Regions:
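Outer membrane beta-barrel translocator domains of Type V secretion systems
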Residues: 5, 9-209, 323-327, 331-347
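Short, structured loop/turn "capping" segments at alpha-beta junctions
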Residues: 205-210, 220-224, 258-265
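Alpha-helical scaffolds that organize eukaryotic protein assemblies
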Residues: 201-204, 228, 254-256
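Solvent-exposed, glycine/polar-rich loop segments of beta-barrel outer-membrane systems
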Residues: 56, 95-104, 133-140, 172-188, ...
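Outer-membrane beta-barrel porins/channels
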Residues: 190-197, 210-218, 228, 232, ...
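Short, structured patches in soluble enzyme cores that scaffold and shape functional sites
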Residues: 166-168, 200, 211-221, 269
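Outer membrane beta-barrel transmembrane domains
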Residues: 122, 237-347
């Protein structure tokens, strides 16, 4: 009588660990952060560009249109050029399947501005940056080289200034995962953004207070990618992150004369609310099989946050100004500190 042999069931495949996609998961968040910073730069330039140049500081604000020349041909110093170098250190805390990250960003900005009519100005600016990202809980890192091109326009009426800005960014991402013979990938990223901000200037003597309200929108896309090398290289899906924010706050500034140099110091605070957010997610699958695909939810900042900073400006000559800026951004799961050194010329 034949004896039936028991068959061993095939092993059940398990999904890939979420850690295999962490470094790619941080890319849209980092790109959005870069875009938000550049939009803030353009808003500042829009706010201080319209009207009489002598009444503006690097922190923005407004000016009295009645004090400005009333024809384009009569406007002195119609043109502006500025150059900035900046550095940023930030941290996103671990949450869920994401192991958190640390970011170091270095970049430079160059821009040109023009007063096209009394109370109306336009500007064009380019931002080139490099972001180095390290995942806190895993041996994973990436480098994002991002180019952003932005434009702004400012409208001034009395103490009111309305600034509008838009950006377009594109860049390359190179990621490394693991040690020894790591898994590596190279892919592209794209960025779009827009901002509108309304401010009102109140001044008394050397003091000024500038309340501001506004909103911004940004969208970041990271291309699909395929890793090579390493023990378990993976394919990653395209990622899309999009958010809309509203914000409001105020700047307080003071101007004084030190010997023959005009000095200006201002501080600002701003509350931020993310009213709409879709951070999508990432699906990873093994290049060579052997495991099931895995979906990982996207990375986002907490809804409510506070921005704060300070600006010191020194007028080196009637048409040249040097300024230094500190910017801090604080969320429940995210913190960023940035420093900027800039030089502005007018003619």
């Amino acid at each position: 009588m034949p004896v039936a042999l028991a068959q061993t069931p095939p092993p059940t495949q398990q999904p890939l660990p979420a850690s295999d996609g962490n470094i790619a998961l941080s890319s849209p968040s980092t790109t959005l952060d870069n875009g938000t910073r550049f939009l803030r730069h353009l808003a500042t330039e829009a706010a201080r560009a319209a009207g009489a140049p002598s009444q503006f500081t690097p922190s923005g604000g407004g000016a009295d249109l009645e004090a400005a020349p009333q024809t384009v041909s009569a406007i002195d110093n119609r043109y502006r050029a500025w150059f900035e170098a900046y550095g940023v250190r930030s941290r996103m805390d671990p949450r869920g399947d994401f192991g958190g990250d640390k970011r170091r960003i270095f970049g430079g900005v160059a821009g040109l501005g023009l007063i096209i009519a009394p109370g109306i100005s336009v500007g064009l600016s380019v931002d080139q940056s490099r972001s180095d990202v390290d995942i806190i809980q895993y041996v994973q890192s990436s480098r994002i080289d991002l180019t952003q091109i932005g434009g702004n326009i400012a409208f001034e009426s009395g103490p009111w200034v309305l600034g509008v800005a838009a950006i377009r960014g594109f860049g390359d991402i190179d990621s490394t995962r693991g040690t020894g013979a790591p898994s590596v990938a190279s892919y592209g990223t794209n960025l779009w953004g827009a901002l509108a901000e309304l401010s009102y200037l109140w001044s008394s003597g050397n003091w000024r207070v500038v309340p501001k309200i506004g909103m911004d929108w940004a969208r970041a896309e990271s291309d699909a990618y395929s890793e090579t090398g390493g023990a378990v290289p993976v394919n990653g899906s395209e990622q899309i992150a999009e958010r809309t924010r509203i914000f409001g706050g105020a700047e307080v500034g003071y101007t004084w004369l030190a010997n023959t140099m005009v000095m200006d110091l201002s501080v600002y605070g701003r509350a931020v609310d993310i009213v709409s957010q879709n951070v999508g997610g990432l699906t990873i699958s093994p290049v060579n099989g052997g495991a099931l695909p895995r979906f990982i939810a996207g990375v986002s900042e907490d809804r409510f946050g506070v921005d704060t900073g300070a600006i010191l400006s020194m007028r080196l000559a009637p048409k040249a100004r040097l300024y230094a800026v500190y910017d801090g951004r604080f969320r429940g799961n995210f913190e960023s500190h940035a420093g900027t050194l800039g030089l502005e010329f007018r003619w």
